A protein has these predicted regions:
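The feature captures the beta-strand-to-loop junction immediately N-terminal to the Walker
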Residues: 13-15
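Helix-to-loop junction immediately C-terminal to a conserved catalytic motif
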Residues: 28
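Conserved ABC transporter NBD signature motif
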Residues: 36-44, 53
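Conserved ABC ATPase "signature" region
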Residues: 77, 92-111
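Conserved ABC ATPase signature
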Residues: 115-119, 123
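Conserved catalytic motifs of ABC-family nucleotide-binding domains
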Residues: 136
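Catalytic Walker B motif of ABC-type/P-loop ATPase nucleotide-binding domains
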Residues: 140-144, 149
Length: 176
């Protein structure tokens, strides 16, 4: 059991197989707890719709597909899905502003029209964080955000996320 104040960063550290990812999956509704509750702002995330939960919690997973046939902008725009109107409709100008802000925050403006498959590992990870930011969550969950990245890209990702105005829960197995 833990309580985390808004705007704080919680690092979950442990060796491979210790249950870090399982805990995170409980927090972003991939697994339903067999007992207890997961609450955000006093609301049990299993007592609200998946769409409402996706407006509260965004996750960047340790293993991401890399064969997207989408541009960086299209992937980041997927973060607006919990706010879509009707079947696939968008909130137009507001969504565009939020996507632009997420791209800017992750220093991806020059990449917006590039295909995901042409990016380096660090660039792809920044895209996935930008997609999560476009969800406008209260809580950002990062499962091994520096996994498979060289030291330069690890530092780049950590630098970009450290000042985000969100509650961040991240798992790490490498303390370096």
């Amino acid at each position: 059991s833990f309580d985390l104040s808004p705007g704080r960063v919680l690092g979950i550290v442990g060796p491979n197989g210790a249950g870090k990812s399982t805990l995170l999956r409980l927090l972003y509704r991939y697994h339903k707890p067999t007992s207890g509750t997961v609450e955000i702002g006093g609301t049990d995330i299993w007592k609200i719709t998946a769409r409402s939960a996706a407006r509260k919690v965004a996750a960047v997973l340790q293993e991401q597909p890399t064969d997207f046939a989408l541009t960086v902008r299209e992937i980041v725009t997927l973060g607006r899905t919990p706010y879509s109107v009707g079947f696939g409709g968008s909130n137009g100008a507001r969504d565009a502003l939020i996507v632009d802000a997420a791209l800017n925050r992750m220093d991806l403006n020059g990449f917006s029209n590039r295909s995901m498959g042409t990016l380096s590992g660090g660039e792809r990870q920044r895209v996935m964080v930008a997609r999560a930011l476009a969800q406008e969550p209260c809580v950002l969950i990062l499962d091994e955000p520096t996994n498979h990245l060289d030291i330069r890209h690890q530092l780049e990702i950590l630098e970009l996320i450290k000042d985000l105005p969100l509650t961040i829960i991240t798992s790490l197995h490498d303390l370096n």
